[in-house]
Amino acid sequence: MKQNNYGGFFMENKALNNRLIIISIFVFLFFSALTLKLVNVQIINKDKYKKSLDDIKVDEVYSTSTPRGRIFDRNYNLLVDNVGVRTIYYKRKPETSTKTQIELAYKMADKIDLDYSKLAKTNLKEFYLVNNKDKVNKKITEKERELLKQRKITISDINNMKMERITDEELSNYDEKDKKAAYIYYLMNKGYYYDEKIIKTYASNEEFAYVSEHVKELKGFNVKLEWERKYLYGDTFKTILGSVSTNESGIPFELKDKYLSEGYSLNDRVGVSYLEYQYESLLKGDKATYLLNDDNSYTVIKDGIRGNDIVLTIDINLQKEVEQILTEEIVNAKMNNANTTYYNGSHVIITDPKTGEILAMASKQIVANNGEYKVYDNTPALLTNPVTPGSIVKGASMSVGYKTGAIDIGTKMLDECVKIRNTPAKCSWTKGLGYLDDVKALAYSSNAYQYKTAMKVAGANYYYNGPLTVPESAFETYRKVFLEYGLGEKTNIDLPVESYGYKGTSYESGHLLDMAIGQYDTYTPVQIASYISTLAANGNKYKLHLLKEVHEKTNNEKMGKVVRNIEPELIGTVDLEQKYKDRIKLGFESVMKSLGYGYMGTVPSPAGKTGTAESFYDSDGDGKIDVPTISKGFIGYAPSYDPKFAITVLSPNVRYSTNSEYTSPVNSKISSRVSNKVFEILK
């Protein structure tokens, strides 16, 4: 007989129902409690909780701009300062409607003189649209509205249609006042709504006073003193000092990612070139911080403060003299010297070889304009425009010979033409120099001595008009030593742009001989300045730099205390025995008694090296060098026994290679005058 299980089934059902009842009661009580809590928070104690929220919610707003740090020269002459600029700005209030904004734009159009030439047609259409909403809305068809409802087009598509359908005829009804108001309206709404919008800088006294006296009725318009950079020495060194973006431009597009990642706002004024860019983190000011109150007023939390003042290594009085000398001599050469068809400027760099400090650096370019010559600053070329150095590299070339054992102190060789099969003969600049030792080879700038040394370095077997084979390693032997002097590598000077120069890619034997006399690889003027500085400093290569001191931030006229001194940074040494370094120095001293006589004016105990290079010029601007020219160079230092300064003077394409042998003396004139001026100022 089967057992009856119905009783067990009903017992289980009853237990399940009891559990459901208990859960339902619990859920009911939970939501009842939650409802009571919400009533308490949102109705009964609303003000209490709102106050608590306000206590922990702080709306901090930052001012738009703070003056940058000032820039001084090494003698604390002020180079770059900030000057106040009367500025009218607009900051939209939350309750301000579009209609009110339009009214304000027209009111301001009556009161301020504003150039609206930058008003784009799109901006004018936008102004027309907000002024004629009903009329413009009728330009959208019912079919298009239906497509919008069906989400087949977007509201953005609709707005674009409206803009496209506003006709030129409709816009032609706008007069000058309308256009000025349209431009003001555009400026009022440019960028983020919560930003201060610059409406006009350099406002007149009357405009400034009007806005100041009518702040309440102008609802968002106000005035303040903004700042602009002032250059106390005019255009002297101005290019390298750099530039700062305007209120209107804010962060340039190409620098947007960099600056936004560092916490900047799009409308911030930032350094965009050279030293202003390089030292943006020091020069930028700290913005004032305000607390946004419930009534939209502001309470100052933290005052703004000017950026760090910085002191440069530059001597501005020397810089000014160098630029003046360059300008005078370049113009004189172009107007009065023959064979200067393709000569268009010269370069000068003055350094302290014991520290790497740059005392002056300038390059000037001359351009014919309507029959007259105009001179422009070209100082960035010192960093980016490589030159063929010629014989000025022979000090480094001698180092290669000594280091490899190819030559030694007193090694003599006959100065004679070298001829490799199927190539033209390679000779010195003049004949009859005879047998020369290492010092006289420098003094008389013997090419043959360097050719023969290079062949020894390469382990090559040479005979006149025979084949010559050299290993690639010989090129690298030269380049390695040249690098120790700073030739062929970036100097990493504290400026944002610099190039390497050109490194030849052919390893033909003749090119090794060319390299030994500075006719193969090319170097930037700043690399050549590093080379002569290293040689003058007994083989110690100090990093070239322009920053000397950083001072703490302050709003006072007086500079803050020094927070950072830039110490000389030794970045390398020339691996060469002292006796050989002394021999090269002796050769450089001998140069100044022969080919280099007068190149350093009347400066006592000079040492240096002249250079002549066969170069080429792109005569038609097509990117191809097509005209053979001659370039001149000079490097030196003084006094030879305790160098106080090193000088680099380069004049590319100074002679057009015609049948005439005449070469303008512009390079020696610049070098002589500048050297005298340096000694006069520094002694």
Which residues make up each language-model segment?
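Beta-lactam-recognizing serine transpeptidase/beta-lactamase-like catalytic domain environment
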Residues: 78-81, 86, 288-305, 314, ...
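Short, solvent-exposed cationic patches
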Residues: 95-115, 325, 375-393
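Short helix-capping/linker segments at secondary-structure and domain boundaries
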Residues: 96, 116, 245-254, 407, ...
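Short, gly/Ser/Thr-rich active-site loops of penicillin-recognizing serine hydrolases
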Residues: 557, 665-683
